[in-house]
C-alpha cells in the first residue's frame, strides 16, 4: 500500500511526460490510497485542461470515471490535528499535508512528484522514479 497524491493520479489521464513512471509505480504496488481531497483536486486539474481545450469534455468525464474506479474504497478521511501539525512544521499547504498525514498515519510512503513535499518530508515522501526502481 502507498499513498499517492493527485499529481500522480492525474498523470495517468492528462498529457505529460511523467506517465511512464506512474505506470511503473502502479505495476510495483497497485494498492493506492489517498485522502478524500484527491477528488476535488483531480477535478480542478481536469478543469484546467478542459478550459484550455487540451482535453474534450467527454475525455474529462471518462478520466474522472476511471480515476474514481481506481481509487474506489481507497479514500480516507484525515485527522485535522495531524494535518495542522504538519503544516506547522513545514511550508507546505494544508492540502499537501493531508497526503503527508495519511501516509504517516498508515506508515506507508507518499509517492509524489511535488518537490516541496519531497524536500520537507524526506522520511515520508518518495519520487515515483525512486519508488519504481
Where does each model-flagged region fall?
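Active-site-proximal, substrate-binding regions of enzyme catalytic domains
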Residues: 43-72, 80, 86
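Short, well-structured N-terminal submotif of metal-dependent ribonuclease cores
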Residues: 1-37, 49-58, 116, 133
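A cross-family signal for key residues in well-ordered alpha-helices
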Residues: 10, 44, 84-85, 101-104, ...
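Non-catalytic, surface-exposed connector residues within folded enzymatic/regulatory domains
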Residues: 36, 54-61, 77, 97, ...
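Active-site neighborhoods of divalent-metal-dependent phosphate/nucleic-acid chemistry enzymes
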Residues: 72-113
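Acidic, PIN/NYN-like endoribonuclease modules and their adjacent C-terminal/linker elements
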Residues: 1, 100-133
Amino acid at each position: 500500500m502507498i499513498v499517492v497524491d493527485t499529481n500522480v493520479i492525474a498523470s495517468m489521464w492528462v498529457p505529460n511526460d511523467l506517465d511512464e513512471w506512474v505506470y511503473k509505480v502502479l505495476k510495483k504496488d497497485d494498492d493506492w490510497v489517498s485522502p478524500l481531497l484527491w477528488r476535488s483536486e483531480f477535478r480542478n486539474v481536469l478543469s484546467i485542461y478542459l478550459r484550455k481545450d487540451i482535453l474534450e469534455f467527454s475525455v474529462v468525464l471518462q478520466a474522472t470515471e476511471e480515476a474514481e474506479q481506481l481509487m474506489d474504497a481507497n479514500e480516507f478521511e484525515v485527522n485535522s490535528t495531524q494535518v495542522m501539525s504538519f503544516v506547522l512544521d513545514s511550508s507546505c499547504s494544508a492540502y499537501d499535508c493531508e497526503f503527508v498525514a495519511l501516509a504517516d498515519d498508515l506508515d506507508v510512503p507518499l509517492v509524489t512528484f511535488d518537490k516541496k513535499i519531497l524536500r520537507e518530508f524526506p522520511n515520508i515522501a518518495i519520487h515515483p522514479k525512486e519508488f519504481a526502481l
